[in-house]
A protein has these predicted regions:
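Gly/Trp-centered helix-boundary motif
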Residues: 1-173, 322-342, 351-356
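Alpha-helical transmembrane segments of integral membrane proteins
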Residues: 144-356
């Protein structure tokens, strides 16, 4: 007979769980859909907008337009004799000491500020040109980073990576921990003692040392991150499942299953693990934020995902390095990371309270 733990209901009184689920769902939805509609690839570099400030208004402003125009004129060895903006079009009068090659005007379309230029009038044997240059409007809600990449898109892509690592690493920890703890608790005796001594030995290993060794052996890879974290975090899960198994195997329905000739794997799968589902789910709800925090810490140390991919830990590390002049690089990733961790911690606490 299976006596499952009581279900956790989303009643109006359980508002912390409802609020946590709403926040997590919103963050996951934004991270999933946001990069598709932002208009900026996460790895695209805007050289004319390095460390641009966050703004809901479109770039370029007057200063950015002037600086971009001066840079192009310098590279083309031209003089800007007159400049007038009419709506979204910049009217320029250009001159040089020699005839201007029209192909040189391609420098405008290669910039992030202007669209392809159009020659309106040619004078003085090609040494003077009247040119119309449309402006290229771009919005950076969260600004740009030190490489000129859109921080809004990168923050949401980082959320995908961090959430994926949190879920996958927790799944690895769940799979290993439940199997290991159930076998140890059901076997008992010397097998249980030996298996739990192994757990204690692995517990004694420094987490960062373990990660560094694996990175040196296998290299930095996205899959390695959640495997490494999951291979460490299963230890706590194993202890919880082992304790539950020691209690459950003394129940009458387990003795009845043994008397009927059920095999040990069948008893564990059909009777022991289902009856331990309450504590397992509660621990899993607390484990996910821990895993995300560990991934952020590993990425902060430079052992996480590689460029051009990113995670919240990588962005927080970049923001910490540039906090003096560009605090927005730290604020936005930290807000997303903090909100996710707080919601997960609240969800785990509410779940644990509801399964008691």
């Amino acid at each position: 007979m299976i006596e499952l733990a009581p279900a956790v209901h989303l009643s109006p009184r359980n508002w912390p769980m409802r609020a946590s689920l709403a926040i997590l769902g919103l963050i996951a939805l934004v991270c999933l859909i946001g990069p598709l509609v932002s208009g900026h690839p996460y790895d695209q570099v805007y050289r004319d907008y390095v460390l641009a400030r966050p703004s809901p208004f479109a770039h370029p402003d007057a200063t950015e337009t002037r600086e971009a125009l001066e840079g192009i004129a310098r590279r083309m060895r031209l003089r800007v004799e007159a400049s007038r903006q009419d709506g979204e079009v910049l009217h320029l009068a250009l001159s040089a000491d020699r005839p201007i090659d029209p192909r040189a005007l391609r420098a405008f379309e290669r910039s992030d500020v202007f669209r392809p230029a159009r020659i309106v009038e040619t004078r003085d044997a090609g040494r003077r040109l009247s040119v119309d240059v449309p402006l290229k409007r771009t919005v950076f809600l969260f600004g740009t980073d030190a490489n000129g990449r859109d921080l809004f898109t990168r923050t949401l892509i980082a959320g995908r990576i961090s959430l994926a690592v949190g879920l996958l690493a927790s799944f690895v920890a769940l799979t290993i921990g439940v199997a290991y703890g159930a076998v140890a608790g059901y076997a008992g005796g010397r097998i249980d003692a030996l298996m739990m001594r192994i757990v204690e030995i692995v517990y004694a290993l420094p987490f960062i040392f373990f990660v560094i060794v694996l990175v040196m052996v296998f290299g930095r890879h996205f899959v390695l991150i959640f495997v490494t974290i999951g291979a460490v975090e299963w230890l706590g899960m194993a202890r919880i499942v082992r304790g539950q198994t020691l209690s459950i195997k003394q129940r009458d329905f387990v003795a009845a299953a043994e008397a009927l000739g059920a095999t040990a794997p069948a008893i564990l799968w059909r009777h022991v693990v289902p009856n331990a589902s309450g504590p397992i789910a509660a621990y899993l709800a607390v484990l996910v934020p821990r895993v995300i925090l560990l991934e952020s810490f590993v990425s902060f140390l430079g052992l996480g995902v590689q460029e051009p991919l990113t995670s919240w830990g990588v962005l927080v590390a970049d923001g910490a390095r540039n906090i003096q002049g560009s605090v927005h690089l730290l604020i936005f990733p930290a807000l997303f990371l903090g909100a996710t961790l707080a919601a997960l911690q609240s969800l785990g606490g509410a779940w644990a309270a509801g399964t008691r």
